[in-house]
């Protein structure tokens, strides 16, 4: 049973479920690694980390299968509106969220995030096991976030923690318990001379970061490009035609200076996903791996006295420029994406 009855929608869900199923065995394996670290069994920890890295690489391959049967046009215009939710959707015509009419006339408006695989416990489990810490979107490593005026502020908590509220209670409590017992990063850091241990740990970070890179590419193809095509089409319509266009709850509405394209989880996901990707490399143990995984956006810079080259076509402002057959377009930091595996990773 799907909203649209389309194979595209079924495939969208199927890929997400396949990732969950393939990732499932990682949980007991890495819990075993935690126990091995407590016993000081480095060989077992290395074995588990190597299998973890290989499985993460497989998950990236599954994620890329989204392209096979889920058409970006169908996803953006037909499927995504049903996943939009009612939180932070004022620009889409839902300033107060949604109201579930029970016939009494007294029901309040409620605001809930749309369906998002950021609500999946498995991706958050990966981060916890590897010691990856995610800050609220826009917050720097020093603990504050930069406002438009350049001042610093400290946000409450991040989107990833918010999504735990949508998890089944046992899943949420399991993650909280794993946070208390996770020891892999500390164990590896205390044995830096064990090259096999350090390399296998850093390889896991690299594979998880690559998975998030692939997700950003999917967001760009399924959301950003389709959003720009939709805007271009809207500008070509006459005022009468434009007024008759059906409102797409998941699309951008141009109201004043507002142009935020929200993800289905209710957040602007491009800055969220970029920051989550960059944070994934921060715990790397080896200095060279850390420089490689934390390579900042755009151009050439200096880190620890070593010249670094930024991510391809990503400027110092964080803006990503893509050059293709249809010309040049850029991913604005204020725009979002899907909040699912063509969405999550995250998240959600």
Where are these regions (language model features)?
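Surface-exposed peri-terminal alpha-helical interaction modules
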Residues: 1-348
């Amino acid at each position: 049973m799907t909203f649209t009855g389309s194979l595209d929608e079924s495939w969208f869900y199927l890929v997400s479920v396949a990732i969950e199923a393939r990732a499932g065995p990682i949980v007991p394996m890495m819990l075993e690694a935690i126990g091995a670290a407590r016993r000081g069994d480095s060989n077992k920890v290395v074995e588990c980390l190597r299998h973890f890295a290989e499985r993460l690489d497989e998950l990236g391959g599954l994620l890329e299968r989204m392209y096979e049967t889920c058409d970006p046009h169908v996803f953006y215009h037909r499927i995504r509106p049903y996943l939009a939710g009612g939180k932070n959707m004022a620009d889409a015509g839902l300033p107060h969220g949604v109201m579930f009419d029970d016939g009494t006339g007294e029901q309040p408006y409620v605001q809930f995030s749309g369906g998002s695989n950021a609500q999946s416990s498995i991706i958050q489990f990966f981060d916890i096991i590897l010691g990856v810490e995610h800050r609220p979107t826009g917050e720097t490593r020093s603990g504050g976030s930069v406002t438009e005026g350049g001042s610093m502020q400290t946000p409450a908590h991040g989107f990833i923690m918010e999504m735990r509220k949508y998890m089944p209670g046992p899943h949420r409590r399991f993650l909280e318990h794993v946070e208390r017992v996770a020891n892999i990063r500390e164990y590896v850091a205390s044995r830096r001379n064990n090259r096999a241990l350090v390399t296998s740990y850093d390889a896991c970070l690299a594979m998880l970061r690559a998975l998030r890179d692939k997700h950003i590419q999917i967001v760009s193809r399924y959301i950003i490009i389709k959003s720009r095509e939709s805007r271009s089409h809207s500008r070509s319509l006459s005022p009468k035609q434009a007024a008759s266009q059906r409102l797409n709850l998941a699309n951008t509405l141009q109201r004043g200076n507002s142009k935020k394209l929200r993800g289905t989880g209710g957040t602007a996901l491009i800055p969220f996903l970029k920051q989550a990707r960059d944070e994934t490399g921060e715990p790397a143990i080896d200095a060279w791996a850390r420089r490689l995984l934390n390579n900042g956006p755009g151009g050439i810079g200096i880190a620890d006295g070593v010249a670094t080259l930024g991510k391809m076509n990503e400027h110092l402002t964080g803006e990503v420029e893509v050059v293709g057959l249809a010309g040049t377009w850029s991913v604005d930091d204020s725009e979002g994406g899907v909040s699912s595996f063509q969405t999550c990773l995250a998240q959600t």
